[in-house]
Amino acid sequence: MKKGGVRSYRRSSTSKRSVIDDDSEPELPSMTKEAIASHKADSGSSDNEVESDHESKSSSKKLKENAKEEEGGEEEEEDEYVVEKVLKHRMARKGGGYEYLLKWEGYDDPSDNTWSSEADCSGCKQLIEAYWNEHGGRPEPSKRKRTARPKKPEAKEPSPKSRKTDEDKHDKDSNEKIEDVNEKTIKFADKSQEEFNENGPPSGQPNGHIESDNESKSPSQKESNESEDIQIAETPSNVTPKKKPSPEVPKLPDNRELTVKQVENYDSWEDLVSSIDTIERKDDGTLEIYLTWKNGAISHHPSTITNKKCPQKMLQFYESHLTFRENE
């Protein structure tokens, strides 16, 4: 053989043939180790970012829910008030029953005390029962009906015309009494003269002439005596002015309410009223005064009446509820 005609083949280790079966999957192109490692690192970091975003969103949501729960709890705590004691009671203006003056726990200022109806006091029934036990028990319904407070119009001052009529009537009565006294005096003098004429002069007067005191006195003394007689006739001694009865504390059992008719005849309530309890403003703007009498009874009247009947008690109530602001 000729050397020039021989071909030489170099077999490489990387050029192996791989036999591919019909059922086997095709072989994917191979990747370097560095590419695989970088791909895994990228996929792991993206997964961590997704998980961290999800955790941050869930934690922020929980914080918001906790904040809402705390705010709701604070609002509930702020709206809680506790009744410490029942101080007084009064008849309800509408719907019957009673209203109670409540003192709240932690509020010692009397102006913070409030009136509440019996229906609104369902949470302090034990305190209400204790209050009635201290005051001799709850009154029967029949008694409460008898003590209903009728409305009374405000007392009106007499007009100048009516006052003048009363004065004229009083002067007329006085003149009639003076005339009656003078008439009796004249009749008595006539009777004495008749007896003198029938029986004759008394002993010691032989001429039958009785010298009167006026005849023996000087003219100036006679004039003074005449003026005195006129003054005595104008003011007869048998006419005595009528005295008004002194006011007395109304004698009523406890837990009864005084009506305006029972106390309107008293000129002054200063010695009858124990205390002014509270003042209430009506829908028409007028003030209603609730007060307690010294016998334990309670009542309420317009301020136009109490200002005249017990002005000192009203002044004490206003002074006790004054608040002063310090100068900064």
From Swiss-Prot:
<comment type="function">
    <text>Recognizes and binds histone H3 tails methylated at 'Lys-9', leading to epigenetic repression. Involved in the repression of the silent mating-type loci MAT2 and MAT3. May compact MAT2/3 into a heterochromatin-like conformation which represses the transcription of these silent cassettes.</text>
</comment>
<dbReference type="GO" id="GO:0140463">
    <property type="term" value="F:chromatin-protein adaptor activity"/>
</dbReference>
<dbReference type="GO" id="GO:0000779">
    <property type="term" value="C:condensed chromosome, centromeric region"/>
</dbReference>
<dbReference type="GO" id="GO:0007533">
    <property type="term" value="P:mating type switching"/>
</dbReference>
<dbReference type="GO" id="GO:0003682">
    <property type="term" value="F:chromatin binding"/>
</dbReference>
<dbReference type="GO" id="GO:0042802">
    <property type="term" value="F:identical protein binding"/>
</dbReference>
<dbReference type="GO" id="GO:0031934">
    <property type="term" value="C:mating-type region heterochromatin"/>
</dbReference>
<feature type="compositionally biased region" description="Basic residues">
    <location>
        <begin position="1"/>
        <end position="14"/>
    </location>
</feature>
<feature type="domain" description="Chromo 2">
    <location>
        <begin position="267"/>
        <end position="328"/>
    </location>
</feature>
<dbReference type="GO" id="GO:0007534">
    <property type="term" value="P:gene conversion at mating-type locus"/>
</dbReference>
<feature type="modified residue" description="Phosphoserine">
    <location>
        <position position="220"/>
    </location>
</feature>
<dbReference type="GO" id="GO:0007535">
    <property type="term" value="P:donor selection"/>
</dbReference>
<dbReference type="GO" id="GO:0003723">
    <property type="term" value="F:RNA binding"/>
</dbReference>
<dbReference type="GO" id="GO:0030466">
    <property type="term" value="P:silent mating-type cassette heterochromatin formation"/>
</dbReference>
<dbReference type="GO" id="GO:0033562">
    <property type="term" value="P:co-transcriptional gene silencing by RNA interference machinery"/>
</dbReference>
<dbReference type="GO" id="GO:0000785">
    <property type="term" value="C:chromatin"/>
</dbReference>
<dbReference type="GO" id="GO:1990813">
    <property type="term" value="P:meiotic centromeric cohesion protection in anaphase I"/>
</dbReference>
<dbReference type="GO" id="GO:0005634">
    <property type="term" value="C:nucleus"/>
</dbReference>
<dbReference type="InterPro" id="IPR016197">
    <property type="entry name" value="Chromo-like_dom_sf"/>
</dbReference>
<dbReference type="GO" id="GO:0044820">
    <property type="term" value="P:mitotic telomere tethering at nuclear periphery"/>
</dbReference>
<feature type="modified residue" description="Phosphoserine">
    <location>
        <position position="246"/>
    </location>
</feature>
<keyword id="KW-0597">Phosphoprotein</keyword>
<dbReference type="GO" id="GO:0140727">
    <property type="term" value="P:siRNA-mediated pericentric heterochromatin formation"/>
</dbReference>
<feature type="region of interest" description="Disordered">
    <location>
        <begin position="132"/>
        <end position="259"/>
    </location>
</feature>
<feature type="region of interest" description="Disordered">
    <location>
        <begin position="1"/>
        <end position="81"/>
    </location>
</feature>
<feature type="compositionally biased region" description="Basic and acidic residues">
    <location>
        <begin position="151"/>
        <end position="194"/>
    </location>
</feature>
<feature type="compositionally biased region" description="Acidic residues">
    <location>
        <begin position="71"/>
        <end position="81"/>
    </location>
</feature>
<dbReference type="GO" id="GO:0000792">
    <property type="term" value="C:heterochromatin"/>
</dbReference>
<dbReference type="Pfam" id="PF00385">
    <property type="entry name" value="Chromo"/>
</dbReference>
<dbReference type="GO" id="GO:0003677">
    <property type="term" value="F:DNA binding"/>
</dbReference>
<feature type="domain" description="Chromo 1">
    <location>
        <begin position="81"/>
        <end position="143"/>
    </location>
</feature>
<keyword id="KW-0805">Transcription regulation</keyword>
<feature type="modified residue" description="Phosphoserine">
    <location>
        <position position="227"/>
    </location>
</feature>
<dbReference type="InterPro" id="IPR051219">
    <property type="entry name" value="Heterochromatin_chromo-domain"/>
</dbReference>
<dbReference type="GO" id="GO:1990758">
    <property type="term" value="P:mitotic sister chromatid biorientation"/>
</dbReference>
<dbReference type="GO" id="GO:0031507">
    <property type="term" value="P:heterochromatin formation"/>
</dbReference>
<comment type="subunit">
    <text>Interacts with histone H3 methylated at 'Lys-9'. Interacts with the cohesin subunit psc3. Interacts with hrk1. Interacts with the CAF-1 complex at the G1/S-phase transition and early S-phase, but not in the G2 phase.</text>
</comment>
<feature type="modified residue" description="Phosphothreonine">
    <location>
        <position position="240"/>
    </location>
</feature>
<dbReference type="GO" id="GO:0031509">
    <property type="term" value="P:subtelomeric heterochromatin formation"/>
</dbReference>
<keyword id="KW-0539">Nucleus</keyword>
<dbReference type="GO" id="GO:0140720">
    <property type="term" value="C:subtelomeric heterochromatin"/>
</dbReference>
<dbReference type="InterPro" id="IPR008251">
    <property type="entry name" value="Chromo_shadow_dom"/>
</dbReference>
